[in-house]
């Protein structure tokens, strides 16, 4: 019985390692199966977005890198679309040269080599593999730095500057034209009707110590009136145009000119000699010469010394004595006025009047009687004032006698 137990024990002991081996093999198989199953889970994954980027800001002219940021097993394939849904493709020839504007890498990077302002917008990355597809969108913003706006503003500034310059030049031309017209009008006035006649009349009045005729007075009055009228016209013309007040005080200037030539300022009086009993009350027959005007050293008594360099001129004075008719004498006594006429008008009235008591006597045609003074004609020299003063009382004794003085240069 003991032998049988020992034999069973010996038989059982060899079977234990076998069981351990069998269990070990079974455990190894299960582990292998579990490992293989885990490997299959890791290698077969759907693409996932590992990072999200909202927008990218790029300066115009620079390059831009846009990352899709998608991971998957196996590696997904990437496609890029712009904001209008157009698929971006890299041309083969550009890919071989390594150039081109759009460069797409296998890792999901989109490289825009030279960004323009028209490239702004949203870019969508589509990543796909055998397990699925995922999309990722990134917005590209471009900073506009092109020189077109600078050129635009430069053109606007040049146009504005040109307009301002044209307006200024037009205004200056209008001012210049206005001043030229004003100057031309003033010069034309004084050249035709102004200072020339007035100066001539007063030069004759200065050279002869008597008033020549009533026509000189009329000329002076007309000239003064026209001068003042032109001054008012120039003043109104200057006020009508919005220009600087260059000739606003033209009337004052004209009045000063009148004072210089002796029409406004009180000075020395020279009165024409009238017959006895006749009052020279008419103020129109009185000329005034200002005291401020001094005669020059010229022998011709000019207002300036210009005649010192000129040849001397001689003045001849012709005196005509004409008896008045009875009708004219009666009119003078009744009306109490004395009218002065020119030499030509007096001679014509004396020749054609049928009521004249006796014919007029002229120094060149008729000789006077011993009772009347002999008229004197000096063709080549100026009569001295003493001779004139000596002959005047003899002539003025007759109330019916009219004395006419005529001067010739």
From Swiss-Prot:
User: SMART domains given for it?
Assistant: IG (SM00409), IGc2 (SM00408)
Cite the record's Basic and acidic residues compositional bias ranges: 339-355
Lineage, top-rank taxon, reads Eukaryota
**Where on the chain is Phosphoserine found, per UniProt?**
298, 303, 306-307
Where is it found, in Gene Ontology cellular component terms? cell junction; cytoplasm; neuron projection; nucleoplasm; nucleus; plasma membrane
Q: Which cysteine residues pair off into disulfide bonds? A: 68-125
Tissue specificity remark? Highly expressed in testis.
Phosphotyrosine PTM positions: 287
Give the matching InterPro entries: Ig-like_dom, Ig-like_dom_sf, Ig-like_fold, Ig_I-set, Ig_sub, Ig_sub2
- Topological region Cytoplasmic: 173-409
Which residues are noted as glycosylation sites?
33, 37, 67, 111, 135
Q: Which residues lie on this side of the membrane: Extracellular?
A: 29-149
**What is the protein name stated in its UniProt record?**
Microfibrillar-associated protein 3-like
**Source lineage:** Eukaryota, Metazoa, Chordata, Craniata, Vertebrata
């Amino acid at each position: 019985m003991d032998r049988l137990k020992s034999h069973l024990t010996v038989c059982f002991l060899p079977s234990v390692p076998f069981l351990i081996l069998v269990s070990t093999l079974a455990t190894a198989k299960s582990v292998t199966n579990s490992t293989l199953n885990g490997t299959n889970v890791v290698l077969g994954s759907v693409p996932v977005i590992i990072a999200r980027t909202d927008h990218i800001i790029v300066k115009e002219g620079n390059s831009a890198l846009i990352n899709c940021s998608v991971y998957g097993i196996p590696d997904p394939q990437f496609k890029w679309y712009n904001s209008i849904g157009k698929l971006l493709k890299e041309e083969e020839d550009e890919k071989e040269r390594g150039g081109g504007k759009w460069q797409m890498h296998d890792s999901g990077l989109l490289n825009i080599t030279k960004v323009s302002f028209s490239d702004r917008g949203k870019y969508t990355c589509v990543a796909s593999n055998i397990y699925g597809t995922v999309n990722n969108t990134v917005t590209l913003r471009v900073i506009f730095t092109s020189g077109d706006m600078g050129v635009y503003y430069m053109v606007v500034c040049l146009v504005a500057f040109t307009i301002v310059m044209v307006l200024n030049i037009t205004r200056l031309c209008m001012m210049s034209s206005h001043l030229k017209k004003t100057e031309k009008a003033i010069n034309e006035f004084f050249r035709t009707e102004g200072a020339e006649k007035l100066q001539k009349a007063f030069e004759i009045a200065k050279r002869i110590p008597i008033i020549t005729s009533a026509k000189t007075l009329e000329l002076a009055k007309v000239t003064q009136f026209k001068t003042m009228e032109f001054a008012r016209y120039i003043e109104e013309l200057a006020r009508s145009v919005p220009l600087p007040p260059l000739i606003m005080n033209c009337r004052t200037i004209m009045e000063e000119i009148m004072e210089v030539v002796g029409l406004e300022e009180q000075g020395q009086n020279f009165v024409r000699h009238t017959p006895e009993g006749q009052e020279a009350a008419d103020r129109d027959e009185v000329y005034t010469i200002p005291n401020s005007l001094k005669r020059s050293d010229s022998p011709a008594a000019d207002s300036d010394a210009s005649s010192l360099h000129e040849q001397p001129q001689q003045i001849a004075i012709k005196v005509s004595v004409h008896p008045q008719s009875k009708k004219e004498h009666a009119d003078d006594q009744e009306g109490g006025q004395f009218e002065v006429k020119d030499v030509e008008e007096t001679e014509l009235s004396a020749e054609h009047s049928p009521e004249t008591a006796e014919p007029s006597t002229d120094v060149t045609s008729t000789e006077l009687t011993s009772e009347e003074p002999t008229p004197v004609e000096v063709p080549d020299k100026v009569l001295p004032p003493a001779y004139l003063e000596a002959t005047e009382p003899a002539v003025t004794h007759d109330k019916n006698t009219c004395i006419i003085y005529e001067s010739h240069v």
